[in-house]
Amino acid sequence: MFGWTFQDSKGPRGQDYAVARSGNVYVAGLVEIPAAADGAKLSRWLPYVSVANVDEAVSRGVDAGASVAVSARDVNLGRVAALVDPEGAVIGLARSAFGDPDETTTAPAAGRPVWTELLTDDTAAAATFYAELGGYDVNTIDRRGGQYTLLASDGKNRAGILKKPSDKIMPVWLTYFGVDDPAAAAVLAESLGGKIILPASQELRDGTMAIVTDPSGAVLVLQDWTELRGVR
């Protein structure tokens, strides 16, 4: 799908874990999770907020109304935890033992995660929560006729917050992956066992994105990475 290569490893509880690379850049980790008793699809992409101290960030999050999904723990690459925010979206927290990656390795490009976006009920409350959790600045811009909330740090936009388009959708963080052609990438995803949720069309951000699920049911957004130059 993205031309990634993988390095096999083990998770903190001995479960299978794979580290994904796009070229020479580490872009993601894949971990095996237990199946749900009711057969529900649990697979998802989980973005992580880089914090100076994971344990302190967990405490700040809980004080602000979050609950702990995964308690703070040491892993091969540092220390991590996960929270359920006050609206119900799951977010990871991490402190890498090797420091944050160089900005040049996280610039938008095909085959890499290029953006992350929270769909939630209350964008203002979510912005306040994440500003406290991760020390972000909050900015609002006009985007295609509507208001779009941005979380920024060090003068760079890191994530977006958007009101959920439907009550049928649970609050969730979406991960965007850079592609050259969203329509063709969606067809490729389907041929590899995924499903197209929303095909690329002019009605969906002028055809610059498509939404699919992978074979495990995890939702991902396929984004024309060149369109992010004005946001990131």
Describe the residue ranges of each PLM region.
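A generic structural motif
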Residues: 33-34, 75, 97, 164, ...
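Acidic/His-leaning functional-site neighborhoods
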Residues: 149-178, 183-188
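Short glycine/proline-centered loop/turn elements that form peptide/ligand docking sites
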Residues: 142-147, 202, 228-229
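Vicinal oxygen chelate
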Residues: 21-26, 47-87, 123, 176-219
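Conserved donor-binding loop and adjoining core beta-sheet/short helix segment
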Residues: 10, 22-25, 29-39
